[in-house]
Design a protein with these regions (language model features):
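Pore-lining transmembrane helices
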Residues: 1-31, 35-243
């Protein structure tokens, strides 16, 4: 099928709703046949229904949408690419592993899978690396703004950040959401936009600094990452109030 990742997402949601419908449909079956539901009826019927709908209806629709998306991305000018890169980068920091983060990541993975273009992967990877790196930076240079426990935890975010594990920032974001998330969004958006401005690309779905050897224009990717990290780290450091030990 040429439906691409959008069609795959639609198929997943469709399969879930069909299973819910089938459970209601067969609710009145004799209990002696209860064991057939999960091992025979649900899998076979849902596969048949989803497959039929995908082949005749959903597949062609999303194939056209996917083709339009590919053409749009191919014809996108630098200004639009920078804006989209900034949006994707910022989304990675909004909820740090939640729906916005996963939506940006899934979109970039889909574009990479369908077109082989890893430019948006560079944007989301930079955006996802910045929250933990910015926290690590802030806890290092603004010690009076964090407790002893936070400073110790902040050190581990250096490793988490370079590994593209955004979730390392969640404990800090939970305790101070406005300052941590707000600062991280700004830094991640700047970094995401810069990756597109400087035409960087990472043809890998994960890995952080450990896949930098695969990147196109890796030096510029690192510069974008550094700029975003410094901006977010400084915002966190100056925005937070000193803590009383």
């Amino acid at each position: 099928s040429n439906a691409g990742f959008l069609g795959g997402l639609a198929a997943g949601f469709l399969a879930g709703y069909i299973i819910v419908f089938l459970k209601k449909l067969f609710r009145g079956m004799p209990k002696s046949l209860e064991g057939l539901k999960p091992i025979l009826l649900y899998p076979l019927l849902s596969l048949f229904i989803v497959g039929t709908l995908m082949y005749f209806i959903i597949g062609p629709i999303f194939s056209s949408i996917n083709t339009a998306v590919v053409h749009f991305l191919s014809d996108m000018g630098t200004a639009n690419a920078v804006l989209l890169g900034a949006l994707l980068g910022g989304m990675m920091s909004i909820d740090m592993g939640g729906p916005f983060n996963k939506a940006a990541y899934t979109f970039s993975i889909g574009v990479f899978t369908d077109t082989g273009d890893g430019s948006f992967m560079a944007a989301v990877m930079a955006g996802g690396m910045i929250p933990p790196l910015a926290i690590a930076l802030a806890t290092t240079f603004f010690k009076n703004k964090f407790t002893d426990e936070e400073r110790r935890s902040g050190l581990s975010n250096y490793l988490l950040g370079i590994s593209f594990i955004t979730e390392g920032a969640i404990p800090f974001a939970a305790s101070d959401p406005l300052r941590i998330i707000g600062s991280s969004i700004v830094g991640s958006a700047v970094a995401g936009g810069l990756t597109q401005l400087w035409n960087t690309a990472i043809p890998a779905p994960h890995g952080g600094i450990f896949v930098i050897a695969l990147a196109e224009r890796p030096i510029m990717f690192l510069v974008a990452l550094l700029v975003g990290t410094v901006i977010a780290g400084l915002l966190i450091g100056f925005w937070r109030k000193p803590v009383k030990q």
